[in-house]
Design a protein with these regions (language model features):
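Terminal, low-structured helical/coil segments at or just beyond the last alpha-helical repeat
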Residues: 9-26, 233-283
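Alpha-helical segment of the N-proximal tetratricopeptide repeat
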Residues: 21-60, 67-74, 101, 105, ...
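Helix-start (N-cap) detector for alpha-helical repeat units in TPR-like alpha-solenoids
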Residues: 25, 59-60, 93-94, 127-128, ...
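Structural signature of tandem alpha-helical TPR/SEL1-like repeats
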Residues: 38-50, 71-84, 94, 106-118, ...
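TPR/TPR-like alpha-solenoid repeats
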Residues: 68, 102, 136, 170, ...
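Ankyrin-repeat and related helical/solenoid repeat scaffolds used for protein-protein interactions
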Residues: 191-266
Length: 283
């Protein structure tokens, strides 16, 4: 699961009282923000670092440093920077939210949940914090709490399809099939280009024996992302069930090649096995 990041740079988040170094630190902070605008992330990182050194109490310097480091994939360094931002300003909800998101991405679940909970306490309307909190809780197996977090995220971030998708996945896990379908359909309604949601919906319909419905969902998944191997694999399962062996061969071959190209060897082997079944049945 990919945590979402609230990524708007913050310039003047509760600035501490002016110190002699402050103008220079602010100048460096502004320089860093301008560099981010120009797409010069590495140079921006250097400017934010300098701003933070000139004034360690300048929370936005640490915060924007964290965002920039996260952009370059330096998760641990990003988490450290967000942590420094929370130390400089203990009421900085977005810093706690991003700290939690970075820790979640690094699979540090307990700590992530604690910081996300703090972000929510500081700003109960931060939808992305509720969403990431839901992800952490579901990974920790706290499903009922995760459901509540995703529902809250859906209320607060009406244009984000991810909370509805993950809610659907939990319901499916719990065997609440109709609720699962409803949540996945909601995710698709918000974002009609959501291959994972179509695929999961197709899988549920397949399990229910609605082969045409499943096939339609797998087709939509493939149309949303033509490199999404699961969509072709799912279609292959439907075609096998329908005794449409030539069609099955075609999509399973495609799925196998995509899995191979994407380095997903286990599923490439599964597709190969089904492909053999299709070939043998087609003789």
């Amino acid at each position: 699961p990919h945590p979402l990041t609230p990524s708007s740079p913050l310039l003047t988040q509760s600035l501490p009282s002016l110190k002699p170094t402050q103008p220079a630190a602010l100048e460096k902070l502004n320089q860093g923000l301008a560099l981010i605008e120009q797409g010069k992330v590495v140079e921006a990182i250097a400017a934010f670092r300098e701003a933070a050194e000139l004034n360690p109490q300048l929370a936005p310097a640490h915060y924007n440093l964290g965002l920039a480091l996260r952009q370059t994939g330096e998760l641990q360094a990003a988490a450290d920077a967000f942590y420094q931002a929370t130390q400089a300003d203990p009421n900085f909800a977005l810093a706690f939210a991003n700290l939690g998101a970075a820790l979640l991405e690094g699979n540090n679940l307990e700590q992530a949940a604690a910081y996300l909970s703090k972000a929510i306490e500081l700003d109960p309307d931060l939808g992305v914090a509720h969403y990431n909190y839901g992800l952490a809780l579901s990974e920790l197996g706290k499903l009922e709490e995760a459901i509540a977090a995703f529902q809250k995220a859906m209320q607060l971030s009406r244009n984000a399809p991810e909370p509805a998708y993950h809610l659907g996945m939990i319901y499916w896990q719990q065997g609440k099939i109709e609720e699962a379908k409803k949540s996945l359909q909601q995710a698709i309604k918000i974002s009609p280009q959501y291959p994972e949601a179509y695929y999961s919906l197709g899988s549920i319909l397949f399990e229910q024996g609605d082969l045409e419905g499943a096939l339609a969902a797998f087709r939509e998944a493939a149309q949303s992302n033509s490199n999404y191997a699961n969509a072709y694999y799912g279609a292959g399962l439907v075609f096998l069930r329908q005794n449409r062996f030539s069609d099955a061969e075609q999509v399973l071959e495609y799925a196998r090649d995509l899995y191979k190209a994407q380095g997903i060897s286990e599923w490439a082997a599964n597709a190969e096995e089904l492909l053999e079944q299709a070939r043998n049945s087609n003789r």
